Amino acid sequence: MKEKRNINNNFDLGPDAWCSYDYHASVISGTNNFSLATHERKGGVNDSGFIWVDQTRWSADTPENPISILPLIFYRSWINEGCINLEDAQISVYLRGDNLQLDGAQCYFWVLYNDTRWHYTDIPLVLSQNKWADKPHLFSIKKEESKWNNSWTNLPNGPEPLSSVIKNCESYGFSLVGFKQEVTG
């Protein structure tokens, strides 16, 4: 039987290592450029803590196919944790955009392992506008490759198989994909 774990980012004390990825700054600096999310102690769901990021902290990641923005990214190593098995995981999330100009973009959950990223395109996530949703967006991780898109790999012989990435996930987050102009807000 698989061990069940509950990971809860409640943002009571801080941003729990959530960041944005700025691809263009990374190209200029020659190293990955992440900006820590801003933490607010109040104002979240039921006046809880929450985090926020905006377009000053992200840029389109042009090696991704399709081109993606990675506004919320979390590496487990940032909190001294190893990979996590997300097989059949249940995800519950509140996502909010204040004056967010999506320009056709959809929001997706993604996973990364061994220089390979897969976006869970079967479930576009709802971004409530200018207020918190009444209930969280709930979804389950499925291993069916038809429900995913391999957006990037740095491996010379092709991407890491989806099942391996889900089982050994070292990073996960939320992406914006399908925009005509870079998302702002």
Predicted regions and their residues:
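Surface-exposed intrinsically disordered loops and tails
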Residues: I28-N33, N149-E160
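Extracellular ligand-binding interfaces
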Residues: I67-F74, W78-P156, V183
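A short beta-strand-loop micro-motif that forms or neighbors metal/cofactor-
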Residues: Q101, P161-S163
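Extracellular glycan-recognition surfaces and repeat-rich motifs
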Residues: D12-S59
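Short beta-strand-plus-loop segments that form exposed binding edges in beta-rich domains
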Residues: F174-T184
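Noncatalytic modules at the cell exterior or secretory-pathway interfaces
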Residues: S164-L176
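Boundary/junction segments of secreted and surface-exposed precursor proteins
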Residues: K2-L13
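Exposed regions on extracellular, virion, or secretory-pathway luminal proteins
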Residues: M1-K4, I28-S29, T62-P63, L127-K131
